[in-house]
Amino acid sequence: MKFVDEALIKVEAGKGGNGCLSFRREKFIPRGGPDGGDGGDGGSIYFEASSDLNTLIDFRYTRQYKAENGQSGMGGNCTGKKGDDLTIKVPVGTMVYDADTGELLADISQPGIPVLIAQGGFHGLGNTRYKSSVNRSPRQTTPGSPGESRNLRLELRVLADVGLLGLPNAGKSTLIRAVSSSKAKVADYPFTTLHPGLGVVRVSPYKSFVMADIPGLIEGAAQGAGLGHRFLKHLSRTCVLLHVIDIAPLDGSDPVADAKAILNELTQYNPDLLNKPRWLVLNKIDMLPDEKEREEKIQSIIKGLEWKDKVFSISAIESKGTQELCYALMQLIDEMKESEA
């Protein structure tokens, strides 16, 4: 399915029903009092997260949503029917912004919990409400108020425990395929991944975490170059970042320079991302079969980056070192979630 992570829509809550102007007219009761009923409230609009959705594609085709109006009141003190509420299903992780003001209205991350986005209009009052000792036959009513209308910008941020970042062709898609049931597209050219892919990594029957394959970044991504600009935001929700580096690039580029380019993009986009746990994953060790040469390459990269955190050497395509990496990730994620509890 095509991944769509932004959409613009308009929502309009229902208008409240008008109050009724009516008087009781029955045989032998020539001067019956007022009996105009109130209108019904307009329907409100709610957003609710659904685990069955993973894209905002539907909002590209349906851009306007309107809840039902409340019905007007009737004689005999009959209240108008309330307008039905409209509940709009969105993927887990959807951020709802007011498109006109930029205000964040809701961060919808819990499935099954409706979040009010547009309040329905208040019902109008019938003339019965205005009866008093000095006004036995009021002809005053009030109309229902209009419902809230908003222009919204929806933004979907991937909810994942682990985010993979690295240059195109660093082997991120291969890694996520190797450790999960994800069917990420893999080919020998840049930008194979055109949208964030999620994979569930199961380390035991009862323990798992979600890994996000963020599209490859290039220098200038923070300013919109390549595919990185619109996907860097997905890293903000992860617990830990895996910096995947091709240890033996076919184009002869310097892995240290490549890694520094990615770190520079993170710093420019959001320096807070550098405060997250970041582990170095040196991929494609199978391309350096000589053990001495491989170890020298690994140490030169670690020294060149002045890397202080954990380092893992793996071959995603041969699943070497991936199990150790997944167990370490699961342990870290468990510890982080326990500390937050």
UniProtKB/Swiss-Prot annotation:
<comment type="function">
    <text>An essential GTPase which binds GTP, GDP and possibly (p)ppGpp with moderate affinity, with high nucleotide exchange rates and a fairly low GTP hydrolysis rate. Plays a role in control of the cell cycle, stress response, ribosome biogenesis and in those bacteria that undergo differentiation, in morphogenesis control.</text>
</comment>
<dbReference type="InterPro" id="IPR045086">
    <property type="entry name" value="OBG_GTPase"/>
</dbReference>
<keyword id="KW-0479">Metal-binding</keyword>
<keyword id="KW-0547">Nucleotide-binding</keyword>
<feature type="binding site">
    <location>
        <begin position="283"/>
        <end position="286"/>
    </location>
    <ligand>
        <name>GTP</name>
    </ligand>
</feature>
<dbReference type="InterPro" id="IPR006074">
    <property type="entry name" value="GTP1-OBG_CS"/>
</dbReference>
<dbReference type="GO" id="GO:0005737">
    <property type="term" value="C:cytoplasm"/>
</dbReference>
<dbReference type="GO" id="GO:0003924">
    <property type="term" value="F:GTPase activity"/>
</dbReference>
<dbReference type="GO" id="GO:0042254">
    <property type="term" value="P:ribosome biogenesis"/>
</dbReference>
<keyword id="KW-0342">GTP-binding</keyword>
<feature type="compositionally biased region" description="Polar residues">
    <location>
        <begin position="129"/>
        <end position="144"/>
    </location>
</feature>
<protein>
    <recommendedName>
        <fullName>GTPase Obg</fullName>
        <ecNumber>3.6.5.-</ecNumber>
    </recommendedName>
</protein>
<keyword id="KW-0378">Hydrolase</keyword>
<feature type="binding site">
    <location>
        <begin position="191"/>
        <end position="195"/>
    </location>
    <ligand>
        <name>GTP</name>
    </ligand>
</feature>
<dbReference type="InterPro" id="IPR027417">
    <property type="entry name" value="P-loop_NTPase"/>
</dbReference>
<dbReference type="GO" id="GO:0000287">
    <property type="term" value="F:magnesium ion binding"/>
</dbReference>
<feature type="binding site">
    <location>
        <begin position="213"/>
        <end position="216"/>
    </location>
    <ligand>
        <name>GTP</name>
    </ligand>
</feature>
<dbReference type="InterPro" id="IPR005225">
    <property type="entry name" value="Small_GTP-bd"/>
</dbReference>
<feature type="binding site">
    <location>
        <position position="173"/>
    </location>
    <ligand>
        <name>Mg(2+)</name>
    </ligand>
</feature>
<comment type="subunit">
    <text>Monomer.</text>
</comment>
<dbReference type="GO" id="GO:0005525">
    <property type="term" value="F:GTP binding"/>
</dbReference>
<dbReference type="InterPro" id="IPR031167">
    <property type="entry name" value="G_OBG"/>
</dbReference>
<keyword id="KW-0460">Magnesium</keyword>
<feature type="binding site">
    <location>
        <begin position="166"/>
        <end position="173"/>
    </location>
    <ligand>
        <name>GTP</name>
    </ligand>
</feature>
<dbReference type="InterPro" id="IPR006169">
    <property type="entry name" value="GTP1_OBG_dom"/>
</dbReference>
<dbReference type="Pfam" id="PF01926">
    <property type="entry name" value="MMR_HSR1"/>
</dbReference>
<dbReference type="InterPro" id="IPR014100">
    <property type="entry name" value="GTP-bd_Obg/CgtA"/>
</dbReference>
<feature type="binding site">
    <location>
        <begin position="315"/>
        <end position="317"/>
    </location>
    <ligand>
        <name>GTP</name>
    </ligand>
</feature>
<dbReference type="InterPro" id="IPR006073">
    <property type="entry name" value="GTP-bd"/>
</dbReference>
<dbReference type="Pfam" id="PF01018">
    <property type="entry name" value="GTP1_OBG"/>
</dbReference>
<feature type="domain" description="Obg">
    <location>
        <begin position="1"/>
        <end position="159"/>
    </location>
</feature>
<feature type="domain" description="OBG-type G">
    <location>
        <begin position="160"/>
        <end position="334"/>
    </location>
</feature>
<comment type="similarity">
    <text>Belongs to the TRAFAC class OBG-HflX-like GTPase superfamily. OBG GTPase family.</text>
</comment>
<keyword id="KW-0963">Cytoplasm</keyword>
<dbReference type="InterPro" id="IPR036726">
    <property type="entry name" value="GTP1_OBG_dom_sf"/>
</dbReference>
<feature type="binding site">
    <location>
        <position position="193"/>
    </location>
    <ligand>
        <name>Mg(2+)</name>
    </ligand>
</feature>
<feature type="region of interest" description="Disordered">
    <location>
        <begin position="128"/>
        <end position="150"/>
    </location>
</feature>
